[in-house]
Amino acid sequence: MSEPTPQPTPQTTPRTTLVHLLRHGEVHNPRGVLYGRRDGFHLSGLGQKMAQRVADTLGERDITHIVASPLERVQETAAPLAAARGLSVQTDERVIESANVFEGERFGAGKNALKRPSSWRHLWNPFKPSWGEPYTEIAARMTAALHDARVAAAGHEAVVVSHQLPIWVTRLSLEGKRFFHDPRKRQCTLCSLTTVEFEGDRVVRLTYSEPAGDLIPAHARGAAFSAGGAPEEEQP
């Protein structure tokens, strides 16, 4: 009696998962200070409109998981989308703003902390950088959070609400690019989406969009942080 012919093992197609990295909206910051990880900085009225625009844009998508930095401006950005999707926001310390020795300082034309000789000792290594949390550490914590969000929303979509530099460094890491960069050239404006598409656990595509792009003031597009309500001379 002949042996039965072996049957081919069916191939399982990896599930597609989208993780959207969402930057927070405009911050009420009339003194134009670098707020960093400081408490007490909330969305401005315009920032709230930006957050609602994101909720209107993504509200009908297959989003099953929302993660946010613990800082107020990020929680407030996440809230309208969470309400639209009927989800709770999971707070994750790993997607918090990067640490920076210049927190509380101003960088506008009227008063720029970088012009003080006492600040120059922090500027010796822009590749690390010497003034704040190392890029490698930012990338490591953000990437870990990104993959955890992917697992939590496997086969669906997740949103990770974070900050400009952590999102930009994550993108550079995923694209295999060096971390050293000109902050004015980051493609990560207010309430923008950097979307990472996974097949299984493999990154297959990265796209960028600005659902609230028409609401963003021209001066805010190239700024390293938001200063809603600040006079022109105090804008970063």
Predicted regions and their residues:
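Loop-to-helix element that buttresses phosphate recognition and phosphoryl-transfer chemistry
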Residues: E26-E76, L81, W131-T143
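Short glycine/proline- and acidic residue-enriched helix-loop micro-motifs
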Residues: R116-E137, A230-Q235
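Generic beta-sheet signal
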Residues: V19, H156-Q164
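Alpha-helix capping/helix-boundary segments
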Residues: R73, P166-I167
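Short, hydrophobic/glycine-enriched beta-strand segments
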Residues: L18-H24
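Phosphate-coordination/substrate-recognition cap region in phosphate-metabolizing enzymes
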Residues: P6-Q7, Q11-P14, R53-S119
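Acidic, low-complexity terminal tails and accessory targeting/binding regions
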Residues: S2-T17, Q90-T91, E97-A109, V151, ...
